[in-house]
Regions:
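C-terminal substrate-binding subdomain of Rossmann-fold SDR/epimerase-dehydratase oxidoreductases
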Residues: 59, 69, 76, 215-332
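Hydrophobic alpha-helical packing elements
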Residues: 13, 114, 168, 209, ...
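Short beta-loop-alpha junction of Rossmann-like oxidoreductase domains
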Residues: 147-149, 198-201, 271
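Short alpha-helical
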Residues: 12, 37, 102, 201, ...
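N-terminal Rossmann-like NAD(P)+-binding domain of SDR-like oxidoreductases, especially those catalyzing
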Residues: 1-195
């Protein structure tokens, strides 16, 4: 049985990934400081919740016999010394590192704090895993490209981060490659494009426009549209991202910090999405226009051929189908 640690496992992507891993027969531990996590996203699973890292250490010392489907949830920082000790001792085959302090706008206001978590603590986790964990699958971001010159964008595109968050992701990509070269460490970097779907709360700092607008419709609020609404995004449904993580984890390829676009491969404008929502929900969609946000790029669209070639990734669910699934989750 494969053993995994999912950081940020009570968040949007982490919770969906955790549920799929359990379904596939993995033994999963989750660590989440609950700053953006929601334990109810895992409520369908057999959970054993520990309130901090010291309880995790005590639990391991007891050598408790564990049911195969039991998920251990540690409510703490992934960089807690007790967590890192467990990683160092070789407790896991794979770490799926999803935890981060989001997002572009927050990083612009808080560059020091976000760098501490997204860079310094992440390197600490990688260091603890060196020589004891077979592979780290790490969540990078399409934001590393900035305003890409070439669309659809390939991984060979020059990186041009235009926010602290994007720079932090870029820095860890560079470190992952260095760790592979210096320490023979196996780290694969997945550059997520705009991920949306069930489990993403509209008031979360990670939320895409889709989830924010669904939240607004469900609660009788206004749908904020930034700028002229002509910006386009490669919207990637959550099942596709989970699929990519598992394919990368199971791949026989040795990764030396390689980076891969994980996306839908098509782009949709904010205006198109709002128009479709307006047609579907009528007067429930109340649009509030706002200025363009600092640090945001105008267009994103990925070429994911490299991920397809190296570990077989291609999207399972395309945008409009995923949007219907998202409506259903929101019950709107």
């Amino acid at each position: 049985m494969k053993k995994a640690l999912v950081t940020g496992g009570c968040g949007f992507i982490g919770s969906n990934l955790t549920k799929k891993l359990v379904e596939l027969g993995w033994q999963v531990d989750v660590v989440d400081d609950m700053s953006n996590g929601h334990l109810e996203l895992l409520e369908d699973l057999n959970l054993r919740v520990l309130i901090n890292g010291s309880f995790y250490t005590a639990y391991k010392m007891q050598d408790v016999k564990r049911n195969q489907d039991e998920v251990l949830v540690i409510q703490d920082d992934f960089a807690d010394d007790n967590i890192l000790a467990g990683v160092f001792q070789g407790t896991y085959d794979v770490i799926f590192h999803q935890a981060a302090v989001p997002r572009v706008s927050y990083s612009v206001e808080n560059p020091y704090h976000t760098t501490d978590v997204n860079v310094s603590k992440t390197i600490g986790l990688f260091e603890a895993a060196r020589g004891s964990v077979d592979r780290i699958v790490w969540a990078s971001s399409s934001s590393v490209y900035g305003g890409a010159t070439n669309i659809p964008t390939r991984e060979t595109e020059r990186k041009n981060p235009i926010s602290p968050y994007a720079w932090q992701k870029s820095a860890i990509e560079d470190y992952a490659k260095l760790a592979g070269q210096l320490y023979d460490q196996d780290i694969v970097c997945l550059r997520y494009f705009n991920v949306y779907g069930p489990g993403q709360y509209g008031d979360s700092p990670y939320s895409t426009a889709v989830s924010a607008w669904c939240h607004a419709i469900a609660n009788g609020l206004e749908c904020r549209s930034d700028g002229d609404g002509m910006q386009t995004r490669d919207m990637c449904y959550i099942d596709n991202v989970v699929h990519a993580n598992i394919l990368a984890a199971k791949s026989k390829k040795k990764f030396i910090g390689e980076c891969y676009n994980i996306a839908n491969g098509q782009r949709t404008s904010n205006n198109e999405i709002l128009s479709a929502m307006k047609e579907r929900f009528g007067e429930r969609v109340k649009i509030k226009h706002a200025p363009e946000r600092k640090g945001d790029v105008k267009h994103t669209q990925a070429n994911f051929q490299k991920a397809y070639s190296d570990f077989g990734y291609e999207p399972l669910v395309f945008f409009w189908e995923g949007l219907e699934e998202t409506y259903a989750w929101w019950k709107i």
